[in-house]
């Protein structure tokens, strides 16, 4: 525990909070080949690998994921939500932050219905989250 004198001299340091989606905090200047400070809510990227992985201990499934090289040249793993998808290698996708609790290392979500990613077919509820258009009457 610090003395009063130490607190007067140094003071308390406030904790710096870490970002949940660090890859969205950088841009890239291709002329200077340098990362720039350009935070964004979403980023575009190209899928370099699409596959399935198994979740952590109490759960059992084959969760779909895509390895994505973003426009700022950072490569991340993103979860593909919903039933069925049309992604393959070299598909252009839009990602947002948001981790998947039972998949280690997956801190991003692919946005359905944007760029090359199709919305979920036959989805009636929560359509906006899965990029599905309103069904015709």
Swiss-Prot record:
Domain of life: Bacteria
Location of 3-methylthioaspartic acid modifications: 102
GO cellular component: small ribosomal subunit
GO molecular function, one term: tRNA binding
Pfam families: Ribosom_S12_S23 (PF00164)
Chain segments carrying region Disordered: 1-44
GO terms of biological process kind: translation
SUPFAM superfamilies: Nucleic acid-binding proteins (SSF50249)
Sorted UniProt keywords: Methylation, Ribonucleoprotein, Ribosomal protein, RNA-binding, rRNA-binding, tRNA-binding
HAMAP family per the UniProt record, alphabetical: Ribosomal_uS12_B
Family affiliation: Belongs to the universal ribosomal protein uS12 family.
Subunit structure: Part of the 30S ribosomal subunit. Contacts proteins S8 and S17. May interact with IF1 in the 30S initiation complex.
Function: With S4 and S5 plays an important role in translational accuracy.
Protein name stated in the entry: Small ribosomal subunit protein uS12
């Amino acid at each position: 525990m610090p003395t009063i004198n130490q607190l007067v001299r140094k003071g308390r340091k406030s904790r710096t909070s870490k970002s949940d989606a660090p890859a969205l905090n950088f841009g890239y200047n291709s002329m200077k080949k340098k990362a720039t400070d350009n935070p964004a809510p979403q980023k575009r990227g190209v899928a370099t690998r699409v596959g399935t992985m198994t979740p952590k201990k109490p759960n059992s499934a084959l969760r779909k994921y895509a390895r994505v090289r973003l426009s700022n040249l950072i490569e991340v793993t993103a979860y593909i939500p919903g039933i069925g998808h049309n992604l393959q290698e070299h598909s252009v996708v839009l990602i947002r932050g948001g981790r998947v609790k039972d998949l280690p290392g997956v801190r991003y979500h692919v946005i359905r219905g944007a760029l090359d990613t199709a919305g979920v077919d036959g989805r009636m509820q929560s359509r906006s989250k899965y990029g599905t258009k309103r069904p015709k009457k």
